[in-house]
């Protein structure tokens, strides 16, 4: 979780007010982002686990940021699709993706139109403990990450940087 300070710094550098998080778990990343947001900042947080997000809610409340976080307990594809249907395209400043790896590409394609130009998607675990460079590793998560890394490298819609922070953090900035 060493990259949460990077998330907070990115949010501040972007002047972000409206953010997305795909994959909440215990809320560590969303807490870091919420603390970095201005008083009127918001996070739309997506997760499917009520058990883990209950832990997150306790931390958010204790830190006094629960009012900044709109938790959606539903598959992220549904939430992101609904945001697009509701006319939210181009209105988000920052998104953090750390969820089921085999759906990263689907999430990416739904997140990108939600971002404003200059908005940034931070994608976690892109190095996957080095497995993404091992041609012998062919499990679904590793293959999905390898394919996404290649796709992002060639995607003309973004500017790209892969940072060796924690387990690899890709920054995709919408052009």
Model-derived segments and their meaning:
Residues 1-175:
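S-adenosylmethionine/decaboxylated-SAM
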